[in-house]
Swiss-Prot record:
<dbReference type="InterPro" id="IPR001209">
    <property type="entry name" value="Ribosomal_uS14"/>
</dbReference>
<keyword id="KW-0689">Ribosomal protein</keyword>
<comment type="similarity">
    <text>Belongs to the universal ribosomal protein uS14 family.</text>
</comment>
<dbReference type="GO" id="GO:0005763">
    <property type="term" value="C:mitochondrial small ribosomal subunit"/>
</dbReference>
<keyword id="KW-0687">Ribonucleoprotein</keyword>
<dbReference type="GO" id="GO:0003735">
    <property type="term" value="F:structural constituent of ribosome"/>
</dbReference>
<dbReference type="GO" id="GO:0006412">
    <property type="term" value="P:translation"/>
</dbReference>
<comment type="subunit">
    <text>Component of the mitochondrial ribosome small subunit (28S) which comprises a 12S rRNA and about 30 distinct proteins. Interacts with LIAT1.</text>
</comment>
<dbReference type="Pfam" id="PF00253">
    <property type="entry name" value="Ribosomal_S14"/>
</dbReference>
<protein>
    <recommendedName>
        <fullName>Small ribosomal subunit protein uS14m</fullName>
    </recommendedName>
</protein>
<keyword id="KW-0496">Mitochondrion</keyword>
Length: 101
């Protein structure tokens, strides 16, 4: 299967976020700690603000793992609504069927 460039980029961002998350949360906690002096809190504030852009969770975009489409993603399956519909019609997704009245 062909690797989609946007999915590769998104995967890299997820890895960067995963690595930086613990340290960033620790710095955030320490900068809010009122028991520390202001200079120390400013230091931790600087550490949080100077962190890499891609280490932010807001840079992560949900994408279809097959097509790379960024809109209309069914979160539980991580595929686009178009692929979901295709797979549903073929019966590849168990427990899901088309609604009829």
């Amino acid at each position: 299967m062909k690797i989609i460039r946007k999915n590769k980029k998104d995967k890299e961002r997820r890895e960067i976020y995963k690595q930086a998350e613990k340290m960033k949360n620790m710095y955030k906690m320490l900068r809010r700690n009122e028991l520390l002096d202001q200079e120390t809190r400013n230091y931790f504030n600087m550490k949080v603000t100077s962190s890499e852009k891609n280490s932010s969770i807001s840079r992560i975009k949900n994408r279809c793992v097959e097509t790379g489409r960024s809109r209309g993603i069914i979160s539980a399956y991580r595929i686009s609504r178009l692929r979901f519909r295709e797979y549903m019609k073929m019966g590849l997704i168990s427990g899901v069927k088309k609604i009829s009245y």
